[in-house]
């Protein structure tokens, strides 16, 4: 399991420009991530997803996020997320630890 505080810093640097995590948070360029764990791809209410995201059919969890965050466009070809990914496994683990906490508060 990663470090929540390090993960928060990564989120602020790399994700917060496009995503919010708090309950009732607004969608930005990307969807609000509250309730992410256990949710299927392309299911945040009120966000306009690509068919690629809607049709991927996986459920977000630690393993799926670990793979997705390494290279989003490879994992879901056709996603509109314009983020190259996080190559370092430790950084992805930290970010996932933060997301697991922050999207469930």
UniProtKB/Swiss-Prot annotation:
GO cellular component, one term: mitochondrial intermembrane space
Post-translational modifications: Binds 1 heme c group covalently per subunit.
Residues recorded as bearing N6-succinyllysine in the entry: 56, 73
InterPro entries (UniProt xref): Cyt_c-like_dom (IPR009056), Cyt_c-like_dom_sf (IPR036909), Cyt_c_1A/1B (IPR002327)
GO biological process entries: apoptotic process
One Gene Ontology MF term: electron transfer activity
Positions annotated to bind heme c: 15, 18-19, 81
Entry keywords, A to Z: Acetylation, Apoptosis, Electron transport, Heme, Iron, Metal-binding, Mitochondrion, Phosphoprotein, Respiratory chain, Transport
Modification sites for Phosphotyrosine: 49, 98
Positions carrying N-acetylglycine: 2
N6-acetyllysine modification, residue list: 73, 100
Secretion signal, residue range per the UniProt entry: none
Functional description taken from the UniProt entry: Electron carrier protein. The oxidized form of the cytochrome c heme group can accept an electron from the heme group of the cytochrome c1 subunit of cytochrome reductase. Cytochrome c then transfers this electron to the cytochrome oxidase complex, the final protein carrier in the mitochondrial electron-transport chain.
Name of the protein in question: Cytochrome c
Organism of derivation: Lama guanicoe
Name of the gene: CYCS
């Amino acid at each position: 399991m990663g470090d929540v505080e390090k993960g928060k810093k990564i989120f602020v640097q790399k994700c917060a420009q496009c995503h919010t995590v708090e309950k009732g948070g607004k969608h930005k360029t990307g969807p609000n991530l509250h309730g992410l764990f256990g949710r299927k791809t392309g299911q945040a209410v009120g966000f306009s997803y690509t068919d690629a995201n809607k049709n991927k059919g996986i459920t977000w969890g630690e393993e799926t996020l670990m793979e997705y965050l390494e290279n989003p466009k490879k994992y879901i070809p056709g996603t509109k997320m314009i983020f190259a990914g996080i190559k370092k496994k430790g950084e992805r683990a930290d970010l996932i630890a933060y997301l697991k906490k922050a999207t469930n508060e």
